[in-house]
């Protein structure tokens, strides 16, 4: 197995291990994070109904002011956007789902920014 394939398998194992323990409810929905090399995405999902309540990413129009969209500054911007949209819909408490990514760098920056802007987890 190639090193890239091994990396993908390890990420999938981490993702399923984390997802097995985390479940979003109507009272505390799940804040899901996905990152690619170029962008970062965040969604607040109600797992009971299977509906995305709030979403934010570096692809959206609000992030056009960013020069680069795949760095820590962009992740902070997305964290602030998702927290602002969540508070508009009266969502104050969430369960954080790092989606198998290490809690470091962009994922940590997004989480810290969401906390600073009013979300609790």
UniProtKB/Swiss-Prot annotation:
<dbReference type="Pfam" id="PF00861">
    <property type="entry name" value="Ribosomal_L18p"/>
</dbReference>
<dbReference type="GO" id="GO:0003735">
    <property type="term" value="F:structural constituent of ribosome"/>
</dbReference>
<dbReference type="GO" id="GO:0008097">
    <property type="term" value="F:5S rRNA binding"/>
</dbReference>
<comment type="similarity">
    <text>Belongs to the universal ribosomal protein uL18 family.</text>
</comment>
<keyword id="KW-0699">rRNA-binding</keyword>
<dbReference type="GO" id="GO:0006412">
    <property type="term" value="P:translation"/>
</dbReference>
<comment type="function">
    <text>This is one of the proteins that bind and probably mediate the attachment of the 5S RNA into the large ribosomal subunit, where it forms part of the central protuberance.</text>
</comment>
<keyword id="KW-0687">Ribonucleoprotein</keyword>
<protein>
    <recommendedName>
        <fullName>Large ribosomal subunit protein uL18</fullName>
    </recommendedName>
</protein>
<dbReference type="GO" id="GO:0022625">
    <property type="term" value="C:cytosolic large ribosomal subunit"/>
</dbReference>
<keyword id="KW-0689">Ribosomal protein</keyword>
<dbReference type="InterPro" id="IPR004389">
    <property type="entry name" value="Ribosomal_uL18_bac-type"/>
</dbReference>
<comment type="subunit">
    <text>Part of the 50S ribosomal subunit; part of the 5S rRNA/L5/L18/L25 subcomplex. Contacts the 5S and 23S rRNAs.</text>
</comment>
<dbReference type="InterPro" id="IPR005484">
    <property type="entry name" value="Ribosomal_uL18_bac/euk"/>
</dbReference>
<keyword id="KW-0694">RNA-binding</keyword>
């Amino acid at each position: 197995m190639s090193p890239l394939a091994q990396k993908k398998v390890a990420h999938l194992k981490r993702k399923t291990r984390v997802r097995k323990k985390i479940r979003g409810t109507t009272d505390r929905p799940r804040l899901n994070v996905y990152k690619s090399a170029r962008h970062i995405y965040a969604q607040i999902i109600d797992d009971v109904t299977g509906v995305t309540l709030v979403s934010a990413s570096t692809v959206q129009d609000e992030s056009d002011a960013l020069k680069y969209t795949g760095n820590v500054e962009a992740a902070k911007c997305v964290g602030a956007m998702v927290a602002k949209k969540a508070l508009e819909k009266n969502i104050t408490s969430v369960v954080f789902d790092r989606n198998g990514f290490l809690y470091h760098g962009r994922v940590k920056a997004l989480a810290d920014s969401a906390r600073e802007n009013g979300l609790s987890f």
